[in-house]
């Protein structure tokens, strides 16, 4: 019996930790080549031995055997699906009804949020919030969907008094990066962590003495290696996607948490500015 089928059939018997493992494997089956049991255990907040025991419960000798089998099953399933239906986004195909599409999209976003939140190191997050709060100037970089997340964060930070630059043009991003100073912060948003434009800006910022904070995936990447701090995001999306939907959901959960943390750090003044912003915009109606 295929392991994905075994996981589905045994779901009612899983413990809480086993259910976490099962959800992670199904949501990230396309990315398992770069996932180790150690990394997975850290992300899920469980022991490595729990992952090994889960694999053995399904009939595998260990996690490596289970991981390789799942990768093979995923590849075979994708080839079969390609022959009968057109991929529209991630696991969604042209044969799916709107009801099925809605369920798949909702579950994809739910998993992205659950797994990203499970990954947070809250002590490190608090340190990052403190670093941002003291920055004279903040630059936010990103491309495509990540740029939209960055713009949303920049608007929120400006509302509570921070000096922020978030430009869509990559040449402008690079120009701003080279002008950063010690004490300034660059928040680089890139799920892959390998986009050359974002990496170039991070290199320039670091060279100038600025602190680089990366919002990126768990995968080893040039951006992760350059960053002083990382905030990890998890998305079950595969390369078969029409837009970075669950990736953007995961990234927004991180940036929203940063914003609320900064408001909390200086709550009286922040709330005054938020109230003034609200009053001004009300006058425009």
From Swiss-Prot:
Q: Name one GO biological process term.
A: negative regulation of DNA-templated transcription
Single annotated GO MF: carbohydrate derivative binding
Pathway recorded for this protein: Amino-sugar metabolism; N-acetylmuramate degradation [regulation]
Q: Which Gene3D superfamilies match?
A: Glucose-6-phosphate isomerase like protein, domain 1, Winged helix-like DNA-binding domain superfamily/Winged helix DNA-binding domain
Q: Which PROSITE patterns match?
A: HTH_RPIR (PS51071), SIS (PS51464)
Q: Does the keyword Transport apply?
A: no
Limits of the HTH rpiR-type domain: 1-77
| Leader sequence residues | none
Which keywords belong to this entry?
A: Carbohydrate metabolism, DNA-binding, Repressor, Transcription, Transcription regulation
Which CDD domains does the protein's record reference? Answer: SIS_RpiR
The segment(s) forming the SIS domain are 128-268
One Pfam entry for this protein is HTH_6
> Matching InterPro entries, A to Z?
Homeodomain-like_sf, HTH_RpiR, RpiR-like, RpiR-like_SIS, SIS_dom, SIS_dom_sf, Tscrpt_reg_HTH_MurR, WH-like_DNA-bd_sf
Q: Which domain of life is it from?
A: Bacteria
DNA-binding residues: 37-56
Q: How does it assemble?
A: Homotetramer.
Q: What function does this protein fulfil?
A: Represses the expression of the murPQ operon involved in the uptake and degradation of N-acetylmuramic acid (MurNAc). Binds to two adjacent inverted repeats within the operator region. MurNAc 6-phosphate, the substrate of MurQ, is the specific inducer that weakens binding of MurR to the operator.
Q: Protein name, please?
A: HTH-type transcriptional regulator MurR
Name the species this protein comes from: Escherichia coli O157:H7
Its taxonomic path starts at:
Bacteria, Pseudomonadati, Pseudomonadota, Gammaproteobacteria, Enterobacterales
